[in-house]
UniProtKB/Swiss-Prot annotation:
Keywords annotated in UniProt: Amino-acid biosynthesis, Cytoplasm, Histidine biosynthesis, Isomerase
Swiss-Prot/TrEMBL catalytic activity: 1-(5-phospho-beta-D-ribosyl)-5-[(5-phospho-beta-D-ribosylamino)methylideneamino]imidazole-4-carboxamide = 5-[(5-phospho-1-deoxy-D-ribulos-1-ylimino)methylamino]-1-(5-phospho-beta-D-ribosyl)imidazole-4-carboxamide
GO cellular component: cytoplasm
Record organism: Colwellia psychrerythraea (strain 34H / ATCC BAA-681) (Vibrio psychroerythus)
Pfam annotation, one family: His_biosynth
Disulfide bonds: none
Family: Belongs to the HisA/HisF family.
Pathway(s) where this gene product acts: Amino-acid biosynthesis; L-histidine biosynthesis; L-histidine from 5-phospho-alpha-D-ribose 1-diphosphate: step 4/9
Cited SUPFAM superfamilies: Ribulose-phoshate binding barrel
InterPro entries assigned to the protein according to its UniProt record, in alphabetical order: Aldolase_TIM, His_biosynth, HisA_bact_arch, Isoase_HisA-like, Isoase_HisA-like_bact, RibuloseP-bd_barrel
Gene that produces this protein: hisA
Identification of the protein by name: 1-(5-phosphoribosyl)-5-[(5-phosphoribosylamino)methylideneamino] imidazole-4-carboxamide isomerase
């Protein structure tokens, strides 16, 4: 399934290069127009990142998010600076279907695993940004990739599997925002090792060939941000090159999960 992604600063559509606020690109679209275009092109899930909220949770873009989270035909996942349970409650109450949790999921896994149990595995998405060293070790930097958490991927997932985690958005940070191709080996490895998790691949998608390369890995979703905003291909083209069985399953899950919107 293709998952269009939109990053927001001050209510405007932007992209950061490898998470760097100093390397920001603004796009001349409104978030509402982009969402509607993606819906008309066949998107059933969308991913929004509140970059203001990521910097300061008191500056969350609630007015803007309110206009997009209640879309009748889409599952909406929202992330950016979730630091406490009140943030989770706030986003779910706003209408988000899933809350995406990054740094806190790494720093305080006991707390976040409790949220998985409290709100259900369909409501929480772990956002794990992975740094791979020369020896192949997978560590998890936090707070905009500035801090080394000292935590590796396998140890962290062992804790979350016990809680029944279902959705993990996984980014190889060396690929993010580059359009230079994705880390196929990484996704093949994690999908084989953790088959009960629905993996969302993120970072580096710059062509339809990059999407097709992910098909054998077993990922359930592909995050598309800059590539769609800059017209590298259309969403219709991306959806068309993904296996029909996966698309049908996604549509089935979407219709069952959005019935109360």
């Amino acid at each position: 399934m293709m998952i269009p992604a939109i990053d927001l600063i001050g209510g405007e559509v932007v992209r950061l290069y490898q998470g760097d606020y100093a390397q920001k690109t603004n796009y001349q679209y409104t978030v509402q127009d982009r969402q509607q275009a993606y819906a008309e092109s066949g998107a059933t899930v969308m991913h929004f990142v509140d970059l203001d909220g990521a910097k300061d949770s008191t500056k969350r873009q609630l007015k803007t998010l309110k206009t997009v989270v209640n879309h009748p035909s889409m599952i909406i996942q929202v992330g950016g600076g979730v630091r406490c349970e009140d943030d989770v409650k706030q986003l779910l109450a706003l209408g988000a279907d899933r809350v995406v949790i990054g740094s806190l999921a790494i720093k305080q896994p006991e707390l976040v695993t409790q949220w998985v149990k409290t709100y259900g595995c369909e409501k929480i998405v772990l956002a794990l940004d992975i740094k791979i060293d020369a020896q192949g070790n997978k560590t998890l930097p936090t707070h905009g990739w500035i801090e080394d958490s000292g935590v590796n991927l396998e140890d962290l997932l062992a804790q979350y599997q016990d809680a029944g985690i279902k959705h993990v958005l996984c980014t190889d940070i060396s690929k993010d925002g580059t359009l230079t191709g994705t880390n196929v080996d990484l996704y093949s490895e994690v999908c084989a090792k953790y088959p009960d998790i629905d993996w969302q691949a993120s970072g580096g998608i710059g062509s339809l060939a990059d999407i097709k390369a992910l098909i054998p890995t077993g990922v359930s979703g592909v995050i598309l941000g800059r590539s769609l905003l800059e017209g590298k291909f259309t969403l219709e083209e991306a959806i068309a090159c993904w296996p029909k069985t996966s698309a049908n399953n996604a549509e089935s899950n979407t219709s069952s999960n959005t019935g109360d919107k």
